[in-house]
Amino acid sequence: LTARAVFVGGYRMGHALMAFQFDHFLEGIDVTYIVTNIAEKHYKGTLSKYGLDPNRFQYVNDQELIDAYPEILNWDQPGDYRGTWLRQQALKIASLDYFDYETILIQDPDTFAIQPYRCFDGLVPNFFVLPNVTHSNGYYWAIEKGLGIKRQTKDCFVSEFMPFLKQDWHTMRSLLEARHDRHFLDAIIDNCQRESGTNLIWFSEYEYLANYVMTQRSINTTEQKRFEVRKLADIENLNSQEYNCYVDACTRLEDSIQFEFTTNTVVDFDKIYNAIASQL
C-alpha cells in the first residue's frame, strides 16, 4: 500500500479542502492521512459539506507525533519570525518513521496536481523537480554536514511533494544516528547553518530527503510546471495544457483561500473551485 500524509497547519485548512477536490489526479494512493493541529471535528463537520467522504481520511494530530518524538520541539528557534516553519519540517521527517508503509507521499496542501501524477513506479520514486533551480545555500550546507554527501543534482526538489521508501528511511536514520551519535531529529537540526546577522536556520526537508535517495537508488523525475497564484484573480490565466500543478504563492493570507472556523466554511469556495475546474 502507498500512503499519503498531507500536513495541514491552521491557516491551510481552506487550501486542503480545495486540494482534495483534485485528488483524482493523484494515481496509486491507497490511504490519505491528514496530519494537523486542527481539531478533528472541523474536518468531520466540513469535508462532507464539500463533497468529500470523511471516512476516506485518517487523522493524526501534531501532538501525537510530538508525543512520540519530543525532539520535534528542538526545531523551534527563539525569535524565529517564521513561527513553526521548521517544526513543520520536523513533523514531516518524523512521519517517515511513524507511519508503517513501504511507500509514502508527503504533501503540502497549498500545491496540488492538475494533471495525472503517479509518485511511485513500483518501488522507484517519481519526484517532481524544478530544473536548474537553486535555493538558499543553507539547504545544501545541511545536506553535506548532516549526511556527509554533496548535492546530487542541479535540479530542485522543493515541489511540495515528496515520495519516500521506508527502506531508504531506515538507512538514512541509521546513518544520521551513527554519524552524529544522537536522535535523528537532533542530528539534522544540530548540523544546520545559521544565517549571518539573523541567526536563522534555512533548511529544506525536500532537498535533504531527495538528495539522500539519489545516493541509494535510481529515481524518476517529472518536471513540475507550476502555475503560481499570487492573488486569486490569477486563476483566470490557468491552463492545464501548460501546467501540471496549482501552487498557492500568495504572500498575504488575505489574498489566498481562507477558512472560517466558526462556520466551518471556505470563503467563496464555489467561485474559486469553479474558476480552477473550468480551466482543466
Feature map (PLM): residue ranges:
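N-proximal low-complexity "stem/linker" segments adjacent to membrane-targeting elements
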Residues: 1-20
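Short, acidic, metal-binding catalytic loop of nucleotide-sugar glycosyltransferases
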Residues: 20-29
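Short beta-strand/loop segment that forms part of the nucleotide-sugar
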Residues: 29-40, 60-64
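A structural signal for short, well-ordered beta-strand segments and their strand-loop junctions
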Residues: 33-34, 59, 103-108, 112-114, ...
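Active-site-proximal specificity loops/subdomain of glycosyltransferases
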Residues: 42-97
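GT-A fold catalytic core of metal-dependent nucleotide-sugar glycosyltransferases
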Residues: 91-132
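Conserved catalytic core of nucleotide-sugar-dependent glycosyltransferases
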Residues: 117-199
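A glycosyltransferase accessory/donor-loop signature
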Residues: 183-280
